């Protein structure tokens, strides 16, 4: 049995919040709703009868039964940095932040099991907005097969969402196992999120399936939870950009990642993504290799599922990266 707990920060420097699984910290009262109403709503949304959860939301900490090798990861999303409330609905934001965490668990060839969610609200949110955020988290968690077992709510000057994900696996797969002769695979083509961001930044009113997919992938990315990476030699999530994380895998494995652009161009997704790039007069290769915010998995091995995009060879670094591609993903510092 594992007890999952997280000490809360002092609220406004005055008092401690209640511990993690109570999903409460400070009273949020402005005439529209109060803390008790929020907690009651969240308990209803995240209710579960999973036998692995002995104690869930409502006590000082959650008590769960973990798997053989537990995988732990955390990811924080800040309004104005990772998402914008004028671009995305609360439901979409909930999905997006959850996906960022579940993807990191999948990138270790693990299954997401439990989530702890901490949210700071500004006080301007409505109970409906908070409910939709929780429903978005719940929706993505259900897709991943995970359960929210606790968290924390506080009030601050900026909307911040932090999720800790706990997963399990019989055999963790890291970035350092790539071998010469391995194929390089993506669970799905990258670049869609960057395309969606470009559309929003440009004010594009483009319609049609490719444009709708680009916007959707930016607002709430689609993760292939059925992608079987168990036979991979090396594995990584590419949310920081394909060119960045391929370089990290190559360095960790002491090999060279040799890309085959003709294989990428031959994919059906490339043809669709190219339609959006042409409408915006954008460089599709920059989107694919350097766009970031895609939660595809990058794997090496033999006869793996997904899109074959190259081969691991002896040497170091990356080969055949398209000319002019530079990683342009967000750098916090």
Give the ranges of each region predicted by the language model:
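Targeting/processing segments of secretory and organellar proteins
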Residues: 2-3
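Helix-biased detector of long, well-ordered alpha-helical tracts
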Residues: 20-333
């Amino acid at each position: 049995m594992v007890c999952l707990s997280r000490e809360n920060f002092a609220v406004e420097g005055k008092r401690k919040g209640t511990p993690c699984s109570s999903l409460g910290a400070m009273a949020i009262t402005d005439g529209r709703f109060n803390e008790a109403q929020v907690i009651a709503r969240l308990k209803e949304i995240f209710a579960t009868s999973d036998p692995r959860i002995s104690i869930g939301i409502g006590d000082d900490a959650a008590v769960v039964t973990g798997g053989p090798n537990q995988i732990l990861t955390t990811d924080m999303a800040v309004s104005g940095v990772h998402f914008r409330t004028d671009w995305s609905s609360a439901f979409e934001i909930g999905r997006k932040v959850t996906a960022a965490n579940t993807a990191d668990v999948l990138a270790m060839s693990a299954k997401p099991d439990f989530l702890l969610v901490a949210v700071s609200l500004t006080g301007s949110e409505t109970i409906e907005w908070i409910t939709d955020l929780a429903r978005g988290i719940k929706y993505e968690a259900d897709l991943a097969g995970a359960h929210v077992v606790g968290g924390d709510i506080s009030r601050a000057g900026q909307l911040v969402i932090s999720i800790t994900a706990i997963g399990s696996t019989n055999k963790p797969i890291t970035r350092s196992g790539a071998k010469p002769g391995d194929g390089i695979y993506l669970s799905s083509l990258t670049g869609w999120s960057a395309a969606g961001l470009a559309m929003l930044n440009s004010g594009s009113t483009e319609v049609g399936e490719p444009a709708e997919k680009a916007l959707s992938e930016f607002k709430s990315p689609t993760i292939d939870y059925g992608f079987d990476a168990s036979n991979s030699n090396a594995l990584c999530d590419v949310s920081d950009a394909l060119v960045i994380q391929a370089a990290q895998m190559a360095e960790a494995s002491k090999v060279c990642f040799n890309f085959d652009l003709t294989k990428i161009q031959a994919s059906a997704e490339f043809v669709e993504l190219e339609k959006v790039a042409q409408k915006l007069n954008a460089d599709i290769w920059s989107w694919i290799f350097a766009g970031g915010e895609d939660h595809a998995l990058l794997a090496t091995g033999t006869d793996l599922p997904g899109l074959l995009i190259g081969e691991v060879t002896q040497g170091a670094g990356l080969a055949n990266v398209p000319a002019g591609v530079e990683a342009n993903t967000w750098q916090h510092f």
